[in-house]
Curated annotation (Swiss-Prot):
This is Type-1Ab cytolytic delta-endotoxin. Belongs to the cyt1/cyt2 endotoxin family. Kills the larvae of dipteran insects by making pores in the epithelial cell membrane of the insect midgut. InterPro entries: CytB_endotoxin-like_sf (IPR035918), Endotoxin_CytB (IPR001615). Active after proteolytic processing. It comes from the Bacteria. Gene3D superfamilies: Delta-endotoxin CytB-like.
Length: 250
């Protein structure tokens, strides 16, 4: 019997951001602020758009939790840091709570890319927990698939950083954030920033065009947390926050 918690990878290979029908509004945002580059790809599943500004504000807050990787990995790559994220969470207003966090390594040797995707999905599903409605699972599967495939179309995006390269290995980081408000989350919004530090035993030219059927060896560090904040209506934010957050993005 097919596992209901898995969206078939084959369904999203061609267009990983295409979403099946859902009652929730799924919005991928690029927040354009002339004074700040946002290096988190924000994927917001919001049933009530009155809380969309809250999702944007949380994404901006956790941008501060991206830190440089080790010099051995790269000179100027940024990755979401779970430790720094815990510090940032304590400064967010109105206050919320970190209900789960993870700093975990997963690896594989010469196996299909789809196998690595499923390993990472298992880690992130344990973080998301109660928020895992079917639509959220589909978005999560799409995002993780896009972390390891379709990289040629993302290679210059702000959420991906290319690290050191050799004739046998390519390093990169990938940062994504989920903000979820639906029937499962109740009176809170869940914010789940995720940072990946990825080492692939392949040259960059091959990494850029990997598909889920290809085989590769990986070492991946995953850092993430789940932050729960009581729902905040857009009307409760100052008008300046509203203007700066959504100008040119919605």
């Amino acid at each position: 019997m097919e596992n209901p918690n898995h969206c078939p990878l084959e369904d999203i290979q061609v267009n990983p951001w295409k979403t099946p029908q859902s009652k929730a509004r799924v919005i991928t945002l690029r927040i354009d602020d002339p004074n700040e580059i946002n290096n988190l790809l924000s994927i917001n599943e919001i049933e009530n758009t009155n809380y969309l500004l809250q999702a944007i504000m949380l994404a901006n807050a956790f941008q501060k939790a991206l830190v440089p990787t080790s010099t051995e990995f790269a000179e100027d790559a940024l990755q979401f840091s779970m430790t720094k994220g815990l510090e940032v969470a304590n400064t967010i207003s109105p206050p919320g709570a970190v209900v789960q966090y993870v700093d975990q390594n997963v690896s594989q040797t010469n196996n299909q890319v789809s196998a690595m995707i499923n390993k990472v999905l298992d880690v992130l599903k344990s973080i998301l927990g109660v928020a895992l409605g079917q639509s959220v699972i589909e978005q999560l599967t799409s995002a993780v698939t896009n972390t390891f495939t379709n990289l040629n179309t993302q290679k210059n995006e702000a959420w991906i950083f290319w690290g050191r390269e050799t004739s046998t290995q390519t390093n990169y980081t990938y940062n994504v954030l989920f903000a979820i408000q639906n029937g499962q989350t109740g009176g809170v919004m869940y914010c789940v920033p995720v940072g990946f530090e990825i080492k692939v035993s392949a040259v960059k030219e091959r990494v850029l065009f990997l598909t889920i059927q290809d085989s590769a060896s990986y070492n991946v560090n995953i850092q993430s947390l789940k932050f729960a904040q009581p729902l905040v209506s857009a009307s409760e934010y100052p008008i300046a926050d509203l203007t700066s957050a959504i100008n040119g993005t919605l």
